[in-house]
Amino acid sequence: MKKRRKVTSNLEKIHLGYHKDSSEGNVAVECDQVTYTHSAGRPTPEALHCYQELPPSPDQRKLLSSLQYNKNLLKYLNDDRQKQPSFCDLLIIVEGKEFSAHKVVVAVGSSYFHACLSKNPSTDVVTLDHVTHSVFQHLLEFLYTSEFFVYKYEIPLVLEAAKFLDIIDAVKLLNNENVAPFHSELTEKSSPEETLNELTGRLSNNHQCKFCSRHFCYKKSLENHLAKTHRSLLLGKKHGLKMLERSFSARRSKRNRKCPVKFDDTSDDEQESGDGSDNLNQENFDKEKSDRNDSEDPGSEYNAEEDELEEEMSDEYSDIEEQSEKDHNDAEEEPEAGDSVGNVHEGLTPVVIQNSNKKILQCPKCDKTFDRIGKYESHTRVHTGEKPFECDICHQRYSTKSNLTVHRKKHSNETEFHKKEHKCPYCNKLHASKKTLAKHVKRFHPENAQEFISIKKTKSESWKCDICKKSFTRRPHLEEHMILHSQDKPFKCTYCEEHFKSRFARLKHQEKFHLGPFPCDICGRQFNDTGNLKRHIECTHGGKRKWTCFICGKSVRERTTLKEHLRIHSGEKPHLCSICGQSFRHGSSYRLHLRVHHDDKRYECDECGKTFIRHDHLTKHKKIHSGEKAHQCEECGKCFGRRDHLTVHYKSVHLGEKVWQKYKATFHQCDVCKKIFKGKSSLEMHFRTHSGEKPYKCQICNQSFRIKKTLTKHLVIHSDARPFNCQHCNATFKRKDKLKYHIDHVHEIKSPDDPLSTSEEKLVSLPVEYSSDDKIFQTETKQYMDQPKVYQSEAKTMLQNVSAEVCVPVTLVPVQMPDTPSDLVRHTTTLPPSSHEILSPQPQSTDYPRAADLAFLEKYTLTPQPANIVHPVRPEQMLDPREQSYLGTLLGLDSTTGVQNISTNEHHS
């Protein structure tokens, strides 16, 4: 029997990117008692041949796993849900706030979501009612990051919500079961500065110096290190000897340059202990701290054209020092250089130089010149070490009074005392700001000023992000920028519990939700943030129009406005509708267009219930109900409610253009009864007659109506108000149509300015196309032309069918009231036998224009309305003799007085 090959039975687990054992560089495999090795990177041909001879066996398989893939997968999913567009397929709404998520993530992490999505797999939106949005945000971030970043007082709320949503892992974590404590993350997440330090400590030191093998977090730090420490090796041997000789001079012999501890990759045993090392480490730490304190806006970038020596050096301490020195010098009445020199130390007598009628004092020690004796005497104390000014609190002495003034502010609470953190690289003197340090180098080390400037220039070069390649002028800005590429949100809002990745995002949030709105003092317009307010004031009220079109010369206030204006010349319409293919020049026009497809008519008229897509359309429509006619024709004085109507009127009447042919109405036909309507809303309102839908319900009597306007009129019944008063008598009415009926039939007054009746309105506003081959519109036009005959024949037929016993109220007169003189009472007339002669209409003019032209001209021109259309009394409108009291009420008469209906027989008798 063939000897069975022996293979290592244990499965080797190889972690990608990590060594199992630093001592194991090879993997050994035994085959036919012959052990051979091959490098982990590339096996030998003999090994491959041996493996090929082995029969398939599970023991020969190797398990390859990546420890980073799990975290990376969650990271990719978390980054994806924060992008637009993303692969998220679920929208979770909590307290009106929307959260995008992936169904698979929330379903796996929460049994609540698993049950909801299993029951309704096609659900795209889930609304939570028992959880606050701030607590749910913590839970959602836990599902994507497996971490909580909460305050201690928030833990009970998050734990309760986790139990409600059945997120088991979160419940265990918050109960501290089988997990490590949160340490400071649960209790104290102190300041953004500490978070930046932690973030910096987590960065890998992947930049190594080739001269001293030290590691740095940033490439820029390495460049600064080379410029400072190994500058001689970079500039050449000759210049290098000079730099080395200078670097190891007596002043700097005790200083051993070392990187800060958090950037140094060496062990603690290798770090040298001593005053020089400690001082340097403290210096670098203080310098970094000063850089952080100087930075105010993480996204701001400094102008490269600023002076290298004064860049970022403005400091409150230096300003106080300069101001104090200025005040001190101004307060002292110093004699000029030509006057007698006071008490000057022996050997420091100044050299007097006569220069253009002005004497200058020159120091014999340092050749520095002064124009006043007081300044020179103060300068001599630098060489003598004399300090005549003493602090009365701590008894510390100073050489100048200005320095003592600055020192005294340390004991008071007037201003914050700034520590001197900036050390001169040539004499180790400390300064409070970079500005005073730069002045010190130019004054006392002029031979090293050029080198100092070159170092500053190297430092001022941009710091670049390795991920997005964005550049910054300062390292603290880059460190804050790196937070954007992580999951940290160290900046907490002082007004709520929201956290943000940057100070700028936090500021925008505070201005929008807590501090705003910010009104303009000039026009009163409100803005969400101060930036938009400032831009509005500059551009709108400041008269700035700095953006000019190079094609037509038009000037605009905003760059975005100019960009959109240029599309007029180029014809570019970048916003394409994916539904209908229509393109738009502006994004706002495209968003308004989308409402057409989504039937998003969010603006509703309060009077008639008609809905509109745009607010300006609703504003124009409301003028129909208000009767406002603010646009007047300058030629004839006719007023219109809309400006476009005035334009059409002016062009058609006064200019003679046939503008109305451009305005052809859109018609909608009912599928049930084939009636045609002008507007879509009118068709929808009509269709309710077939469907029986009555969406408008009275809350008092539960009666329903098809039209909102009918409900509005109905609500007057439930109130005691009678807002419509008759101008000719004391009668009041609840409805306007009742008042009009009363005026027409009781007082027999009809104003020529009254709006058309219902029948007239139907005739005039009948929409008709102008094409002669359209049968539908020709038929409607013919109906309009024959309409007077229809009324006449209808009246005759109606009266012929009326029974002789029914009295027809042809002429209605007021009944004598108690206060009315008898001689003013009119006699009533009765209906003679030939009733058709009484209702015979007046002769009609047959030379009507076309119906469409009539409808248009009556709307936009001066053509009078036809007022001679007869309104016959229909049988269903006739009153029963027993209901005479209702007619009296309708006409505004006294309820106790009936209306006299005299029959024909009574008249003959």
Swiss-Prot record:
It comes from the Eukaryota. The keyword Nucleotidyltransferase does not apply. Residues 284-295 have a biased composition (Basic and acidic residues). Residues 88-152 form the BTB domain. It is found in: Nucleus. Its main location: nucleus. SUPFAM superfamilies: beta-beta-alpha zinc fingers, POZ domain. One of its GO terms (biological process) is regulation of transcription by RNA polymerase II. One of its GO terms (cellular component) is nucleus. Keywords: DNA-binding, Metal-binding, Nucleus, Repeat, Transcription, Transcription regulation, Zinc, Zinc-finger. The keyword Repeat applies. Residues 252-344 are annotated as: Disordered. GO terms for molecular function: DNA-binding transcription factor activity, RNA polymerase II-specific; RNA polymerase II cis-regulatory region sequence-specific DNA binding; zinc ion binding. Pfam families: BTB (PF00651), zf-C2H2 (PF00096). A zinc finger (C2H2-type) spans 207-230, 361-383, 389-411, 422-445, 463-485, 491-514, 518-541, 547-569, 575-597, 603-625, 631-654, 668-690, 696-718, 724-747. May be involved in transcriptional regulation. This is Zinc finger and BTB domain-containing protein 41. The gene is ZBTB41.
